[in-house]
Amino acid sequence: MATKEEHVRKPDWLKIKLNTNENYIGLKKLMRENRLHTVCEEAKCPNIHECWAVRRTATFMILGSVCTRACRFCAVKTGLPTELDWQEPERVAESVRIMNLKHVVVTAVARDDLKDGGAAVFAETVRAIRRKNPFTTIEVLPSDMGGVYENLKILMDARPDILNHNIETVRRLTPRVRARATYERSLEFLRRAKELQPDIPTKSSIMVGLGETKEEIIEAMDDLRANHVDILTIGQYLQPTKKHLKVVKYYHPDEFQELKEIALSKGFSHCEAGPLVRSSYHADEQVSEAAKARQLKA
C-alpha cells in the first residue's frame, strides 16, 4: 500500500500513444492564429492526441484562459482574469466552420468577477456558431455561474443542444476537491437548466480515484437522476502536477464497465465510462437522437 509520500503507480492501460500528425499540427496552428483556447491544452487532457490527430475535434474554452477559482484537480491557470473579448464568439464560430465540425463543445473558465458569470458571451458564442454552422450540434459546459440562475437563463435562451455541468466528485469530497463550488448548487444548476428548457438534454461527469467509495458513486448517480440528468460520463482522475491532489486509486477497466451498467440501470440515456473518459471525450457520439432531430428542424 502506498504511503502519503508515494505515488500510486500508473497502470499500463493508462499509457497513451502520442500522435502529432498533420491534423494535430493544423488544429494547433488554427487555435493560435485565432487567439483561441482549448480545454484540451489548458487542462492537460490525456486524449488531446486522439481528438486532434485522429477525430479532428476540440473543446473550445472561452472567456480567457485564467480561472477565478482554484479547484485542486484542475490544471487550468488561476488568478486575475483577462478582459472580455466580444470578438471571441465569431472566431470560435469561424473555426468550427473551417474544421467542419458536426458537434462542438464549448466550455469556459469560471468568471466570478463578472456579474453575469460570462453568460452573455457564452450565449453569443452559441448563436454565432449556429449562424455559421446551422447543422452543427452544440454542447455547452459552463461553471455554476455562482448559482445565479438568471445567468443560466441567458445561456439556456440561446438553445444549446446539450447543457453539461459537472459535479466532478461525490458529495463528501466536494469541499476538498472544489472548495468554491458546492455539490448541492451543482445539482440545483442542472435541475434549473432542465426546468428552463425541458427538451434540452442535460449531462454531468464524475472523476473517480480521489478516495470515494462505490456506494458514494452510486449515491451521486441517484442524485443526478433525481435532478433529471440524462447523460453521465465517468473517468479516472489523473494528477496534472505535483501541486494537485494525488490519485488514491486507479480503477480497472472492468470496474468502469460495472459502473456504466449501474448508471444505465438507473435510467441515464447514455453513459460513457472508462479510464481516459473525460466530459467531452467522444461527445459527438453522446448527442441524443432528439437533439439531432431538433437541430435538423431548425
Swiss-Prot record:
Pfam families: LIAS_N, Radical_SAM
Reaction(s) catalysed by this chain's protein: [[Fe-S] cluster scaffold protein carrying a second [4Fe-4S](2+) cluster] + N(6)-octanoyl-L-lysyl-[protein] + 2 oxidized [2Fe-2S]-[ferredoxin] + 2 S-adenosyl-L-methionine + 4 H(+) = [[Fe-S] cluster scaffold protein] + N(6)-[(R)-dihydrolipoyl]-L-lysyl-[protein] + 4 Fe(3+) + 2 hydrogen sulfide + 2 5'-deoxyadenosine + 2 L-methionine + 2 reduced [2Fe-2S]-[ferredoxin]
Keyword presence, Iron-sulfur: yes
Binding residue positions for [4Fe-4S] cluster 1: C40, C45, C51, S280
Places the protein is found: Cytoplasm
Enzyme Commission number(s) of this protein: 2.8.1.8
EC top class, as a word: transferase
TM region(s), chain numbering: none
Residue positions binding [4Fe-4S] cluster 2: C67, C71, C74
Radical SAM core domain span: 53-269
Cofactor(s) needed by this chain: [4Fe-4S] cluster
Protein name per UniProt: Lipoyl synthase
Gene: lipA
